[in-house]
């Protein structure tokens, strides 16, 4: 079973576009992880391995367009290839939802990105749902409920 510690989306310029922490850490520890990993991963060449060791855990990353998807995972328990597949499934799901997702979609619709992520990965870092179709169905239902709620507020 995969147990994620965190997920970061970082632009090629080193700006954090999204971050989600699945284990309890102090603000200092979180800042140190971001400060250490961002330049390390941005400096790596495209042909280098996507898996690196960092302190007490492993880091798996994958670049899609101008964004790096960085995941911290528990060592010896998790499968690095499964973690890469989780990243890929997350990107595919966003691609389907937004229609060819780009960095601007993530910036301006970050709440929807968090909704998709929360449908896929539970708050403890384990996989909740791997089916893209199911995740999209749940997010679409949430969208419908939100739009109905907003309509009722406007009309009342």
Swiss-Prot record:
Pfam families xrefs: Clat_adaptor_s
Organism in which the protein naturally occurs: Saccharomyces cerevisiae (strain ATCC 204508 / S288c)
UniProt protein name: AP-1 complex subunit sigma-1
Alphabetical UniProt keywords: Cytoplasm, Cytoplasmic vesicle, Endosome, Golgi apparatus, Membrane, Nucleus, Protein transport, Transport
UniProt-listed PROSITE patterns: CLAT_ADAPTOR_S
PANTHER family: ADAPTOR COMPLEXES SMALL SUBUNIT FAMILY (PTHR11753)
A Gene Ontology molecular function term of the record: clathrin adaptor activity
Domain of life: Eukaryota
Subunit organization: Adapter protein complex 1 (AP-1) is a heterotetramer composed of two large adaptins (gamma-type subunit APL4 and beta-type subunit APL2), a medium adaptin (mu-type subunit APM1) and a small adaptin (sigma-type subunit APS1). AP-1 interacts with clathrin. Also a component of the AP-1R complex composed of at least APM2, APL4 and APS1.
Similarity-based family: Belongs to the adaptor complexes small subunit family.
Further information: Present with 6370 molecules/cell in log phase SD medium.
């Amino acid at each position: 079973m995969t147990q994620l510690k965190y997920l970061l989306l970082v632009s090629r310029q080193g700006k954090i576009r999204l971050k989600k922490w699945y284990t309890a850490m102090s603000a200092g520890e979180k800042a140190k992880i971001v400060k250490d990993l961002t330049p390390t991963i941005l400096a790596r060449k495209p042909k280098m391995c996507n898996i690196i060791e960092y302190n007490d855990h492993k880091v798996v990353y994958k670049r899609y367009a101008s964004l790096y998807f960085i995941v911290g995972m528990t060592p010896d328990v998790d499968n690095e290839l499964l973690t890469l597949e989780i990243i890929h499934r997350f990107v595919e799901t966003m691609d389907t939802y937004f229609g060819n997702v780009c960095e601007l979609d993530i910036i301006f619709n970050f709440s929807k990105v968090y909704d998709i992520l929360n449908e896929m990965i539970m708050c403890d870092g384990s996989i909740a749902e791997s089916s893209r179709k199911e995740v999209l169905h749940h997010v679409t239902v949430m969208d419908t409920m939100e739009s109905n709620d907003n309509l009722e507020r406007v009309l009342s």
